[in-house]
Amino acid sequence: MATGPRYKVAFRRRREGKTDYHQRLKLIVSRKPRLVVRRTSSQVIAQILVTRPEGDKVLAAATSAELAKTFGYKGSGKNTSAAYLTGLLIGYKAQEAGVEEAILDMGLRENRAGSRVYAALKGAVDSGLEVPCSEDVFPSDDRIRGEHIAGNTASKYTQYEKNGLKAADLPAHFDEVKGKITSQYGAK
């Protein structure tokens, strides 16, 4: 390991691979609320944050687990459909909190068009939240509705059947849950 007066130790969160401080500084300097989208091994998490000197403050939050509890979503909490619905939900919650515009904070995720992060972003944009982005990065509407899953009858979708949903019925179920979210939040 390098030693001596010229050696500089990186910040702890950078060493742990959790924070890109160069990117974070650019996001903070914009003085806009951040739409933070993170995905775990089982769900998608979206938050609207503002930066304060004492730390980040959460204005609104939504998870794909909330979709199952509140709106009866039976699909996987980590697929593209769940990411879109989570983005739609966070967009409506942000508007209830008085946030009209935000910027996307992807964290250390690789920037890949059509990913679940961009599906959540499309949901937020469709709810009316203004986020600067290009339409080219969004996944296709067929993929967001889950038609790629409905067309595949592989045995890897048995979890849907355990939840009482056939993989072929996912697009219709997606539209049903989207309608519930829109009727609860969008009609105001």
Swiss-Prot record:
| This protein's UniProt keywords | Ribonucleoprotein, Ribosomal protein, RNA-binding, rRNA-binding
- GO biological process entries: ribosomal large subunit assembly; translation
What is the top-level taxon of the source organism?
Archaea
Under the heading Pfam families, the entry gives:
Ribosomal_L5e (PF17144)
Keyword Hydrolase annotated: no
Q: Under the cellular component aspect of Gene Ontology, which terms does the record hold?
A: cytosolic large ribosomal subunit
Q: Which InterPro entries match?
A: Rbsml_uL18_euk (IPR005485)
GO terms assigned for molecular function: 5S rRNA binding; structural constituent of ribosome
- Matches recorded under SUPFAM superfamilies: Translational machinery components (SSF53137)
Does the record carry rRNA-binding as a key word? yes
Q: What does this protein do?
A: This is one of the proteins that bind and probably mediate the attachment of the 5S RNA into the large ribosomal subunit, where it forms part of the central protuberance.
User: What family does the database annotate?
Assistant: Belongs to the universal ribosomal protein uL18 family.
Subunit structure, as described in the record: Part of the 50S ribosomal subunit. Contacts the 5S and 23S rRNAs.
| NCBIfam families xrefs | PRK08569.1
- Protein name as annotated: Large ribosomal subunit protein uL18
Protein source organism: Methanocella arvoryzae (strain DSM 22066 / NBRC 105507 / MRE50)
Which gene does this sequence derive from? rpl18
